[in-house]
Amino acid sequence: MSTKEKLISHVMKEEPVGSRNKVTVVGVGMVGMASAISILLKDLCDELAMVDVMEDKLKGEVMDLQHGSLFLKTKIVGDKDYSVTANSKVVVVTAGARQQEGESRLNLVQRNVNIFKFIIPNIVKYSPNCILMVVSNPVDILTYVAWKLSGFPRHRVIGSGTNLDSARFRHLIGEKLHLHPSSCHAWIVGEHGDSSVPVWSGVNVAGVSLQGLNPQMGTEGDGEDWKAIHKEVVDGAYEVIKLKGYTSWAIGMSVADLVESIIKNMHKVHPVSTLVQGMHGVKDEVFLSVPCVLGNSGLTDVIHMTLKAEEEKQVQKSAETLWGVQKELIL
C-alpha cells in the first residue's frame, strides 16, 4: 500500500466536474500577469488558465503562482496549447506586440492583428460561449478585430476601453479636491488613449455638478485649469512607460474590476469599448467606450449619456480616425 492509500480511504469515485467560473488570461507579459494576480487576489474564479507562445516564460510564471497556492483558493493551470483554456467563462486577451516609448497606440495595430488571427480562433474553438475581453492595444480597433474574427454576438466581445482612463481621471480629480476617487464621479468616453473625451458636464461629487459651480471647467478660459487633468490622464501611460518601461498594475486592477462585474453578475456600469454604430452620430462599424452595464451574459445594456455638442463632435472625430485605420486592415 502507498502512503496515500494508508492515509486516505475512498468513499466514492468522484465524477470530474468542470469549473463553474473559469477565467483565462492570454499573454503572460506585464499586463497579463498584473491581470492574473489581481483576479486571483479578488478570488473571482475557481480556475485560472494562462496561455502564451513563449513556453519557458509561461511555465515560470505559472509555477511561481502555483507556489502561492496555499494562500489562494483558485486552481492555476497553464499551457501553450489552448485546450487548457476549455470552457472558460471569461477570456482576457492581453497578448500582443508591446507599445514602445513614444509609439502611438494606433501604430501598433497591424502587428497585433496578425497575432489575433492565431489567438481568436483558438479561443472560439475551446470556449465557444465565453465572454471575450480585449485589453491589447490599440484596444478599440483590436476589439473590433476580435469581434470580426470570433463571429461572436456584440454583447460577448468587450474592450477594456476607458475603464482605466476614467479611473485615472477620478484619481486626479480626487487629488485636486482631497477626496477619495470613489466619491468623484467622472467619465471618459471615446477612444482609449490620445483622443479620449472627458465628459466635464457629468463630473460631480455627491450629485453636485462641478461645471455648475465652475461653468468654464474643462475649457481654455478656466482659471483653475481643470483641462490639465485630462492632459495628465492622456500623458499618464506615456509617463509611466518612460519611467518604468511599461504599464501594468493599474490596467491589471482595471481588468479584475471588469471581470468581477461579469462573474458576479453585478450589473455595474463601466466605460468599456463596444460597437457604437448608430450612437452619438457615429455611422461606421467602430468600437468606442460608452457607459455599459456588465453582467453574467456580458454587456447587457448601454447607458444613453447626455453629451454636449462639442463632446459629441470629439467622439465622432475619434470614430473617423479609427475607421480610417480599420478599413485598411487585412483581416
Curated annotation (Swiss-Prot):
Entry GO terms, CC: cytoplasm
Sequence positions that bind NAD(+): 29-57, 98, 137
MF annotations from Gene Ontology: L-lactate dehydrogenase activity
UniProt-listed CDD domains: LDH_1
Xref: SUPFAM superfamilies: LDH C-terminal domain-like, NAD(P)-binding Rossmann-fold domains
Any Pfam family: Ldh_1_N
Positions with a binding annotation for substrate: 105, 137, 168, 247
Active-site residues (renumbered): 192 (proton acceptor)
EC numbers: 1.1.1.27
Keywords: Cytoplasm, NAD, Oxidoreductase
Family: Belongs to the LDH/MDH superfamily. LDH family.
Assembly information from the UniProt record: Homotetramer.
Name of the featured protein: L-lactate dehydrogenase A chain
Annotated organism of origin: Gobionotothen gibberifrons
